[in-house]
């Protein structure tokens, strides 16, 4: 059982593992009794409440970062090709990690504690890709991996459209790495500009000069807010990225504690039609745009 909003990689691996053993699987039904129930939770109570319904089972196994950072899949499950039929509406897309870990150790991020402060290769593409047309790569910092060239080569040779979902580290960009990235069929590149004290403009400009991905819609940058930044610093990063040909996307840390202006900023930036139609945040009137939208219905 999970939230179903995004394919759960661990559950897909568990499904494949149990099916290979001849076990019968289904999504949880509160009216039934089971030998075993797996519960997966990505977020803590700040973002999602735990399941409070009745579970009839001989054994319940809870996993995911929402339950803690120390739970791990057994090795024989971790390296099982996911059962993509578990989520029929997402079939045709492969999900997985080629590397784990990140050397940055950012205070807002759990990756360093959970996966380690070194990026290491953990799988080849063939472990979770079987010819799907699209690959969603979940690596936290692929470019920090010593095996980056070999792993990017595998992505390029696949011929699949690749979405680098978790943010390539723009500070680690080199001509050699961009040359290899240019060989990958790219659906979406994601970067991040989390710390307003870090001036990353030079890195982003350098990448723009080297990359063959010129469409700003494929060059998304996560902008962290509500974490040691002022509203003015948030706006600076957003305007600067847009001016350089990138597509900013506001992430709000501990959203329940965020001030109204930060929530308004997220609404403006992440609605891409609004963000391109209203060029200045000070001109964004949520009530006015909501009224216009209702009048068009």
Regions found by a protein language model. Name each.
Residues 1-59, 68:
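A short, structured N-terminal alpha-helical element that caps or precedes a catalytic domain
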Residues 19, 156, 239-243:
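Anion (oxyanion) recognition and catalysis
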């Amino acid at each position: 059982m999970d939230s179903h909003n995004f394919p759960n990689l661990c559950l897909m691996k568990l499904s494949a593992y149990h099916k290979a053993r001849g076990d019968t699987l289904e999504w949880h039904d509160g009216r039934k009794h089971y030998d075993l129930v797996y519960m997966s939770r990505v977020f803590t109570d700040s973002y999602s409440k735990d399941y409070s319904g009745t579970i009839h089972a001989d054994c319940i196994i809870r996993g995911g970062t929402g339950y803690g950072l120390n739970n791990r899949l057994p090795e024989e499950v971790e390296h099982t090709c996911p059962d993509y039929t578990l989520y029929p509406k997402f079939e045709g897309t492969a999900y997985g990690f080629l590397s784990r870990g990140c050397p940055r150790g950012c205070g807002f991020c759990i990756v360093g504690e959970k996966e380690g402060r070194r990026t290491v290769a953990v799988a080849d593409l063939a472990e979770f890709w079987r010819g799907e047309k699209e690959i969603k790569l979940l690596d936290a910092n692929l470019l920090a991996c010593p095996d980056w060239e070999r792993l990017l080569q595998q992505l390029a040779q696949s011929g699949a459209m690749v979405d680098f979902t978790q943010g390539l580290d723009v500070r680690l960009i080199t001509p050699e790495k961009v040359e290899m990235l240019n060989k990958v069929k790219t659906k979406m590149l994601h970067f991040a500009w989390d710390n307003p004290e870090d001036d990353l403009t030079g890195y982003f400009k350098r990448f723009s000069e080297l990359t063959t991905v010129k469409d700003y819609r494929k060059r998304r940058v996560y902008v962290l807010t509500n974490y040691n930044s002022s509203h003015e610093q948030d706006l600076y990063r957003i305007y600067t990225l847009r001016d350089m040909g990138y597509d900013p996307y506001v992430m709000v840390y501990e959203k329940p504690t965020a001030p109204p202006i930060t929530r308004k900023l997220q609404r403006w930036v992440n609605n891409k039609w609004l963000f391109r139609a209203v060029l200045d945040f000070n001109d964004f009137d949520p009530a006015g745009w909501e009224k216009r939208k209702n009048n068009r219905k």
